[in-house]
Design a protein with these regions (language model features):
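Short, exposed beta-strand-loop hairpins at the edges of beta-sheets
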Residues: 54, 85-87, 92-112
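Short, surface-exposed beta-strand/strand-loop-strand elements in extracellular ectodomains
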Residues: 58-73
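Positively charged n-region of N-terminal signal peptides that target proteins for export
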Residues: 1-4
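Short coil/turn motif common to extracellular beta-sandwich-like domains
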Residues: 43-52
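Beta-strand-rich interaction surfaces with strong enrichment in secreted/lumenal proteins
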Residues: 38-40, 73-76, 83-85, 94-96
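Bacterial signal peptide processing site
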Residues: 18-20
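C-terminal motif of bacterial Sec signal peptides marking the signal peptidase cleavage site
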Residues: 14-16
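Tight coil/turn sites that cap or link beta-strands
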Residues: 25-38, 70, 79-81, 91
């Protein structure tokens, strides 16, 4: 019985050590300034899915996942007045590049 209790305690310890913080807030908006870029969620986190909505009616922007210094383009781009859904791997960040001459407001929601 003592060994069983020790085993259970070790399992709980291992599970709790692997728990990564969740991204907060779960929804909101941000602006990508004209001809600029922004990086989001550049912190330790578990894998999550994200929904991005471009509120600009004329301009698109490029979205990338960055992990371990490697940048991967999300296809298709975040088109004008459209949405994009994708998964962000554990401890990866999202890089958004705005090539247009207008600021782009993006709404987001996270499912983790």
């Amino acid at each position: 019985m003592k060994n069983l209790s020790l085993t259970i305690a070790l399992v709980f310890l291992l599970v709790s050590c692997k728990t990564l913080p969740e991204i907060t807030p779960k929804e909101g908006s941000f602006e990508v300034i004209s001809k600029q870029n922004t990086t989001l969620w550049n912190e330790n986190h578990a894998t999550f899915s994200v929904h991005l909505q471009n509120t600009n009616t004329k301009n698109s922007c490029e979205v990338y996942i960055v992990k371990n210094g490697s940048k991967k383009w999300i296809s298709p781009s975040l088109l004008a007045n459209k949405s994009l859904d994708f998964n962000v791997p554990e401890n990866a960040s999202v890089f958004i590049e705005n090539f247009s001459s207008e600021n782009i407001k993006i709404n987001y929601s996270i499912n983790q």
